[in-house]
From Swiss-Prot:
Known pathway: tRNA modification; N(7)-methylguanine-tRNA biosynthesis
Family: Belongs to the class I-like SAM-binding methyltransferase superfamily. TrmB family.
Molecular function terms, GO-annotated: tRNA (guanine(46)-N7)-methyltransferase activity
Documented EC number(s): 2.1.1.33
Residues the entry annotates as binding substrate: K117, D149
Protein name: tRNA (guanine-N(7)-)-methyltransferase
Keywords from the named record: Methyltransferase, S-adenosyl-L-methionine, Transferase, tRNA processing
One Gene Ontology cellular component annotation held by this UniProt entry: tRNA methyltransferase complex
Length: 209
């Protein structure tokens, strides 16, 4: 069972130094995909091996998972993958590198903590304030992918993103993956579980305009 961590805890006010792209990756010029709430990082490990022409950055709020993922990267000598520990809201709000923003082409929020109780909705990763941060940081054309098996959470995320003027929904049927990055080449552990149990998956794609 996934351990929930309160992202509003004072423990996450301090963030680790954000390295430069050159420090994180073997080739800093590659396009960058960001996965927020990456857990142990298995999804990104698979993506990094399937598509070596991109760099992958995972942000996770559970420190032990990040430490283990970083160790695995070192042991496997993968050069296009890096992990950061902390609250994604704080980390992205602190990003000062224009190069990181220039290279960042897509972001995924896959099966985030649902925080079912209404009084805990403010702990959900996608909040109006966070989407405002992204609208100011991201370049036009940057993609956002969301995916969950919780309909209420999907509606909440979709409403929050769609109500920001700078993001437009893309019809999945009309989206040409051959012309863009496809994070659906591999599946997260949660997605595999959902598929095996024949549960519903709700997903949507947005583009910064």
């Amino acid at each position: 069972m996934r351990q929930h961590v309160n992202p509003l805890s004072i423990n996450f006010n301090q963030i680790e130094r954000i390295p430069s792209l050159g420090e994180m990756f073997g080739d800093s010029k590659l396009n960058l995909h960001l996965d927020i709430g990456c857990a142990a990082g298995e999804f990104l490990f698979d993506l990094a091996l399937v598509n070596t022409s991109w760099n992958y950055l995972g942000i996770e709020i559970r420190e032990k998972l990040v430490k283990n993922a970083k160790l695995k990267v070192l042991e496997s000598e993968i050069k296009n993958l890096y992990f950061l520990f902390g609250n994604a809201n704080n980390i992205l709000n602190d990003v000062q590198s224009e190069l990181i923003i220039k290279n960042l082409k897509s972001i995924s929020f896959y099966f985030p903590d649902p925080w079912f109780k209404k009084r805990h909705y403010k702990r959900r990763v996608i909040q109006p304030e966070f989407i405002n941060i992204l609208s100011n940081l991201l370049q036009k054309g940057t993609l956002i992918f969301i995916k969950t098996d919780v309909k209420d959470l999907f509606d909440y995320m979709d409403y929050t993103i769609s109500n920001n003027f700078y993001f437009k929904t893309i019809d999945k049927k009309d989206f040409n993956y051959s012309e863009s990055f496809n994070p659906n080449k591999v599946k997260t552990n949660r997605e595999k579980y959902v598929i095996n149990n024949q549960l519903d998956i709700f997903e949507r794609i947005y583009i910064k305009i």
